Regions:
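Conserved alpha/beta-hydrolase
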Residues: 45-68
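Class I SAM-dependent methyltransferase Rossmann-like catalytic core
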Residues: 322-389
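Short beta-strand/loop motif that positions the catalytic acidic residue
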Residues: 208, 214-216
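A short, conserved alpha-helix within the catalytic core of class I
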Residues: 477-489
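Short alpha-helix in the alpha/beta-hydrolase fold that links the catalytic acid
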Residues: 210, 224-233
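Class I (Rossmann-like) S-adenosyl-L-methionine-dependent methyltransferase catalytic domain
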Residues: 361-364, 378-383, 406-419, 425-444, ...
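Catalytic nucleophile-loop/oxyanion-hole region of alpha/beta-hydrolase
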Residues: 35-37, 64-95
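Catalytic active-site module of serine/aspartate enzymes centered on a nucleophile-bearing elbow/loop
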Residues: 246-292
């Protein structure tokens, strides 16, 4: 066994272990349950059944030999896993498709989130008693913890879980009780965030289609195995198995019958690695098509219809008091003008109450996510600019649907020598943007007015970009044939080894409200067909664009990805 540290997304040093590494072997990543650490995985890592695999494990933040404290943000754990996968690729030349992940309890939720939100092309996953919903025996405990964390952000809760409800094995109970690296506490905010993430992932299980094995403990006093069953049923995976481990407690890898667990995992791992990769296609995810049709045809209970109808009526009556709502009602809540207002994030309104309403409007989770998306877009855009500059090339940026220009003016301020073309279909947005260009005296930046979904028009732009931005436009059009035409047009004019930045919206908690209350720039209901991250990445891969980097907000709503056009 060897040990080391890898740098995570925020510069944190995360401790990891490696067993039996040999080039060209398939790889297993095993992630420990909460409170534990990677050293406790030594038995499974050295079991004869797995001797033909590279085995890696790391200590989660605040666990084992990782000195970085626990993050209260669940998504940080998912980002760590994504960075570990990248580290294995750069350090050990291990590709994603050669990785299978095994995870127990909370780690099962982390892996599921990685698969759902980042869409890695891994071979499969085994979830052992995944903690999609934790059993809290005190009534309203989750609500109380959530409220308390508002008052005390660093709230720490002592775990009620004893070794005797984790395993029947007396030796394993004793080892757990005497291990000085076992942590008995959990961050209160992390617990609340974990519960929210688990609920989101179970509700959206249909977005996952990789091979999945779930081993559920029959006598689990820590998490609800009924929720695991719901998750399993909704999975879109063609290869999936659910096994209830008779008489098992929650700590499945440490139970008396754990060698039976090893056998189930080994059999499923072999099966997963033998599968041929799915052919690339532009076919949409069927679950999201059905979801869109339900929204479009308003298939819902009568009381729900009445609720949204009342919200829409209220918006029309008092929405004009809020500056942001008034702009949305006039131009469409998805319009460039409306988004500019959201980006500026300065509450305005009439008669005092309007400003209060506007502040609440701007603080909606979707708009908060939109502002984070802008930050993430600028982060990856600057990274791409520096990559182009380091190769001695002139930076040439194209935004295929840039609205009024917005963040590209920020880029022009920081990098005055870059050449920028902003394509935009709405002429009123162009007028606003050109006014800013004139006022600021910018050079080497211009607008064009073409249909970004017509591949023939890209030649008319008369530009050869090495960075192209697709921001917020694909989310408004659910037709993959249409979006594919745009990507074809981009690739047809791009420089060799150019970057493509594209945004996604794999999940949204307010999708129904948006559809039935807010109007679009087309003066219609703003009904969207969301794309899973894997579907969006598939459109890019179909056009020989390989994703290299991705950022996502803490809520799991908006993503920004960076890919490179393969020569």
């Amino acid at each position: 066994m060897n040990t080391g540290y890898f740098k995570s997304f925020d510069g944190s040093d995360i401790f990891y272990r490696e067993w039996n590494f040999q080039p060209n072997q398939k790889t297993l990543i095993i992630i420990h349950r909460g409170h534990e650490h990677s050293e406790r995985l030594h038995e499974i890592a050295t079991d004869a059944q797995f001797e033909g695999y590279n085995i890696f494990a790391y200590d989660l933040r605040g666990h084992g030999y990782t000195k970085e404290p626990v993050s209260p943000i669940f998504m940080d754990n998912v980002r760590d896993l994504d960075m570990f996968s990248k580290y294995l690729h750069h350090q050990y030349q291990i590709d994603e498709q050669d990785i299978f992940v095994i995870a127990n309890s909370i780690a099962g939720v982390i892996v599921t989130s990685w698969v759902h939100d980042f869409a890695p092309a891994i071979a499969g996953m085994a979830l052992l008693a995944p903690a999609f919903e934790i059993k809290l025996y005190v009534p309203f405990a989750n609500e109380f913890i959530g409220f308390t964390t508002k008052l005390k952000k660093d709230l720490v809760i002592q775990s009620y879980v004893k070794s005797k409800v984790l395993t029947h094995d007396k030796a394993q109970q004793e080892a757990y009780d005497q291990d000085p690296l076992i942590s008995k506490s959990i961050n209160g905010r992390l617990l609340v965030d974990l519960q929210s993430a688990g609920k989101r992932l179970v509700e959206d299980a249909a977005a996952i289609n990789i091979p999945t094995l779930i081993l559920s403990a029959e006598k689990d006093y820590v998490v609800k195995n009924s929720v695991q069953k719901k998750f399993y049923v909704d999975l879109e995976s063609q290869v999936k198995e659910f096994r209830t481990m008779t008489n098992f407690f929650h700590g499945i890898l440490f139970e008396s019958g754990r060698h039976e667990v090893y056998q189930y995992i080994k059999t499923f791992v072999v099966k997963s690695f033998e599968l041929e990769p799915n052919e690339l296609s532009l076919a949409p995810d069927l679950f999201s098509v059905k979801e869109y049709e339900n929204l479009y045809y308003k298939v819902m209970p009568t009381m729900e219809k009445l609720n949204f109808a009342f919200q829409k009526w209220s918006l029309g009556k008092i929405g004009t008091l809020s500056e942001g709502m008034a702009l949305g009602l006039k131009y469409g809540f998805d319009s460039g003008i409306s988004l500019d207002y959201v980006y500026h994030n300065q509450a305005k309104g009439k008669f005092g109450i309007g400003k209060v309403i506007d502040k609440g409007y701007l603080e909606a989770i979707g708009w908060r996510g939109i502002r984070i998306r802008k930050q993430h877009l600028l982060t990856l855009l600057e990274k791409n600019i520096q990559d182009i500059q380091s190769s001695g090339r002139k930076v040439k940026i194209l935004d295929i649907a840039g609205g009024t220009g917005n963040y590209l003016f920020d880029i022009k301020e920081r990098y005055p020598d870059v050449e920028i073309v902003i394509n935009e279909f709405v002429e009123s947005n162009i007028s606003l943007g050109e006014k800013i260009i004139h006022q600021k005296g910018y050079s080497h930046i211009r607008f064009t007015n073409f249909d970004c979904f017509d591949p023939k028009t890209y030649q008319l732009i008369n530009f050869e970009p090495n960075i192209t931005i697709i921001s917020g436009i694909f989310e408004l059009f659910g037709d993959n044939q249409l979006t594919n035409k745009a990507v074809q047009g981009i690739v047809s004019i791009s420089e060799e080894n150019s970057h493509i930045l594209y945004t996604g919206q794999p999940w949204h908690p307010q999708l129904k409200m948006i559809a039935f209350v807010l109007n679009s720039h087309q003066k219609k209901d703003w009904v969207m067909r969301r794309r899973s991250q894997k579907e969006l990445d598939r459109i890019m891969a179909f056009n020989h664009i390989k994703k290299e980097d991705m950022l996502i907000d803490d809520y799991g709503i908006f993503t920004v990805s960076s890919g490179k056009v393969k020569g």
